[in-house]
Amino acid sequence: MSITGMDSSHVTESQGTLLFNEPLAEYTTWRVGGPAARLYKPANIDDLALFLSRLPFDEPLLWLGLGSNSLIRDGGFSGTVILTQGCLKEMTLLSDNCIRVEAGVSCASMARFSARNNLSGGEFWAGIPGTMGGALRMNAGCHGGETWQSVIEVQTINRRGEIRTRKPEEFEVAYRHVAGLGDEWFISAKLQLSPGNKETSLQLIKDLLAHRAKTQPTNEYNCGSVFRNPPGDFAARLIESCGLKGVSIGGAVVSEKHANFIINHQGTATAANIEALIHLVQTKVREQTSIELIREVHIIGDANVQTR
């Protein structure tokens, strides 16, 4: 079938929801971005596999969870977006202190689920504003914890809808980076934690969230950390040392609370404002420190606004 002529009749056997020309701003934590040509909300993993198997092999695909760590440009995305958040949301307690979690589960939910089941080592997920699929994709972490330190195995799916089970040794895992995925996406993982105490873990989560609220602009639209920390230093320290706190382009502002955050002030920024500010910060830091800040955030889509 031709994706350009795709309509709901093409997915009559699917159980999910297919939307057309769907604005993406509401699906991202920055609250910016143009529309997706198509957006699919799968009912479950089997439904996702069926949907993918019927797409043209060259169809552009974008996977979104909570939409953190992503900047969708104002022109939107001309392919199909797969939305996992609120869809692939199963968590199952297994034996041997293990949990099976699907990609659409929020990291915060995973932290609470593990704590309430007397497992420790996953409290740090409460501080990650994304889904477990995204956490697996970039080895997300904070407060001394990283996602892949707990991975026993993962399930991936390719654009033909074929599902594989893979082991950690098949990937190259580093700081905020996972290589070896190829043209596949994470759909679930088996994670092993340590025996713990529910009350202790829940208190750790409470303390972590309080610290996050105190040190990060959690009451403003943001994507999380914009840049990776360079070896032996912190991106926020470098940005602040260059006098960039509070610098703005349009409604995009370098946070006064944490310099490695760019906020969409009162929802007035465009994606173009944010992207321009990212480049400005990189340029100023490079000029003043000779250090190249590497983006943690992914920039996606068409910069030009389309007339539809």
From Swiss-Prot:
Its cofactor is FAD. InterPro entries: FAD-bd_PCMH, FAD-bd_PCMH-like_sf, FAD-bd_PCMH_sub1, FAD-bd_PCMH_sub2, MurB, MurB_C, MurB_C_sf, Oxid_FAD_bind_N. It comes from the Bacteria. It is found in: Cytoplasm. Residues 32-196 form the FAD-binding PCMH-type domain. One of its GO terms (biological process) is regulation of cell shape. GO terms for cellular component: cytosol. It catalyses: UDP-N-acetyl-alpha-D-muramate + NADP(+) = UDP-N-acetyl-3-O-(1-carboxyvinyl)-alpha-D-glucosamine + NADPH + H(+). Disulfide bonds: none annotated. Its EC number is 1.3.1.98. PROSITE patterns: FAD_PCMH. Pathway: Cell wall biogenesis; peptidoglycan biosynthesis. NCBIfam families: murB, PRK13905.1. PANTHER family: UDP-N-ACETYLENOLPYRUVOYLGLUCOSAMINE REDUCTASE. Cell wall formation. Belongs to the MurB family. This is UDP-N-acetylenolpyruvoylglucosamine reductase. The gene is murB.
